[in-house]
């Protein structure tokens, strides 16, 4: 597991000298449940867009941001964090990305595990681990790094791992259901 985390950070933290036209990102900020989480998730997601654009030199048109409330910044947000919009974002990226492209998927917010399935909490119906796997499998020949800063995300390492894909989670186990702060430190690591 440590080697996967190191490889993921190495892949993502090399500061490019030129625009990364074959690099793409999908950042999804989940349903918050209250104002405190809404502000925290917004800060992490909007800061990540800025870091990817300014520090990593990923063109803004290659970055998709879905949030609970797109009106927080209509010029920065691409859509609402719903299952339909998430599926649409994966479809669009799969069609747009070159075969040698790399994709960062950053899930911010709340997740849950009911003893059977992991769910990423969205506005409306949640996305299951099986749905995430189905969407990610469309990027079969491309390098993919999935970072989940959600509680209960440890189960995703079992469900989503495969050759060419790095899965980094905030928790080791699917039973760790407390609020996480991993997203904050993940974003800060790129800023320094």
Feature locations, PLM:
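Solvent-exposed loop/turn segments at secondary-structure junctions
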Residues: 31-35, 69-73, 109-114, 125-128, ...
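Extracytoplasmic/secreted proteins, especially bacterial periplasmic and envelope-associated proteins
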Residues: 40-47, 51, 81, 85-92, ...
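Active-site-proximal C-terminal subdomain of hydrolase catalytic domains
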Residues: 46, 145-192
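Boundary/activation segment at the start of structured domains
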Residues: 16-104, 111-113, 118-119, 145
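Active-site histidine-anchored catalytic micro-motif
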Residues: 126, 136-147, 161
């Amino acid at each position: 597991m440590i080697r996967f985390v190191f490889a993921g950070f190495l892949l993502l933290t090399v500061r490019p000298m030129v625009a990364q036209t074959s690099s793409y990102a999908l950042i999804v900020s989940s349903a918050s449940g209250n104002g405190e989480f809404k502000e925290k998730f917004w800060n992490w997601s909007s800061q990540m867009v800025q870091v990817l654009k300014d520090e990593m030199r990923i063109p803004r048109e290659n970055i998709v941001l879905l949030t609970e409330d797109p009106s927080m910044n209509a010029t920065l947000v691409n859509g609402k964090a719903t299952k339909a919009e998430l599926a649409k974002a994966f479809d669009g990226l799969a069609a747009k990305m070159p075969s040698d492209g790399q994709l960062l998927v950053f899930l911010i917010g709340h997740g849950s595990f009911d003893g059977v399935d992991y769910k990423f909490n969205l506005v409306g119906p949640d996305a299951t681990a099986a749905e995430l796997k189905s969407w990610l499998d469309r990027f079969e020949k491309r390098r993919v790094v999935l970072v989940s800063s959600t509680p209960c995300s440890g189960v995703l390492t079992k469900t989503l791992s495969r050759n060419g894909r790095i899965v980094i989670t905030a928790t080791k186990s699917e039973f760790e259901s407390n609020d996480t702060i991993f997203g904050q430190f993940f974003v800060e690591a790129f800023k320094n």
